[in-house]
Regions:
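Conserved beta-loop-beta/alpha segment of the NTase-like Rossmann-fold superfamily
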Residues: 75-158
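Aromatic-glycine-rich donor-binding/catalytic loop that engages nucleotide-sugar donors
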Residues: 201-215
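Alpha-helical scaffold segments in soluble metabolic enzymes
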Residues: 38, 99-103, 128, 202-206, ...
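Phosphate- and divalent-cation-binding pockets in alpha/beta enzyme and binding domains
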Residues: 57-60, 124, 224
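Hydrophobic packing residues within well-ordered alpha-helices of enzyme cores
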Residues: 58-62, 129, 207
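Conserved core of the sugar-phosphate nucleotidyltransferase
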Residues: 122-201
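Conserved N-terminal catalytic core of the sugar/cofactor nucleotidyltransferase
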Residues: 1-15, 23-111
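A C-terminal functional module that forms or caps the active site or interfaces directly
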Residues: 211-226
Length: 226
């Protein structure tokens, strides 16, 4: 929802640029700054931002070099998600991560955290994934703790895990009829907000071979995970 109190310039930006680059307050700095600050506080040192082929605006804020720009104590690099011939929009989140691994081969054998650029994840959540000893993990939020109405929850992804908290299924933007199928054994809803830890050697082939979702015509990260 876009506020009617926005200025003409703010309204234009809200409709034309990535949500991560919307400017906050009088600083003229993007919302993404806050996520990067939390990543820094959590102990991260290197960040790769996946941008589109027309992603010059990201470079205006975080450095013009393809690799190793300095932002506070972080090293910022970019991976470019190219659009395949015959399409007019990117191929989806699984493809975005796949292209990042192709452009930064070191990630194919490393562990790393993946998240959306337009969600503000807490220091605690980011740190939990950084220090997690499992090779793959994700933050599975409890819906009641998020204090979001169910209508908003339906815009995220609902999950089911087994008794050992291993992921069994995940559904993006479930319909009203699907929602009731995703209560856990205690009757609670669990929500994925797309913040994961992956190990390249284990996720790479699933990204590469991820099928195209027939409804969205994209390669979705939840599909690759499952």
């Amino acid at each position: 929802m876009i506020s009617k109190n926005l200025s003409e310039e703010e309204l234009k930006n809200a409709n034309t640029r990535s949500k991560a680059l919307l400017e906050f307050g009088n600083t003229k700095r993007p919302i993404l700054d806050f996520l990067l600050l939390n990543a820094e506080k959590a102990g991260y040192k290197k960040v790769v931002i996946v941008i589109g082929e027309q992603g010059a605006l990201f470079k205006e804020y975080y450095g013009n070099q393809l690799k190793d720009n300095n932002f506070r104590s972080l090293s910022i690099s970019y991976a470019i998600q190219y659009i395949p011939v015959g399409r007019d929009k990117p191929m989806g989140t699984a493809d975005a991560l796949f292209q990042a691994l192709e452009q930064y081969p070191i990630l194919k054998t490393a562990s790393f955290t993946v998240c959306n650029s337009d969600n503000l994840y807490s220091v605690k959540a980011l740190q939990a994934l950084l220090i997690c000893k499992d090779s793959n993990a994700f933050i599975n939020y409890e819906r009641d703790a998020l204090q979001f109405p169910m209508l908003k929850i339906q815009r995220f992804a609902l999950t089911l895990v087994d008794e050992n908290f291993h992921l069994e299924t995940i559904v993006e933007k479930p319909s009203k009829n699907e929602v009731s199928n995703y209560k856990d054994v205690k009757g609670r809803y669990r929500v994925s907000m797309n913040v994961f830890k992956f190990t390249g050697t284990e996720i790479y082939s699933f990204l590469k071979n991820c099928p195209i979702d027939p409804k969205r015509n994209e390669k979705e990260l939840p599909t690759a995970i499952l």
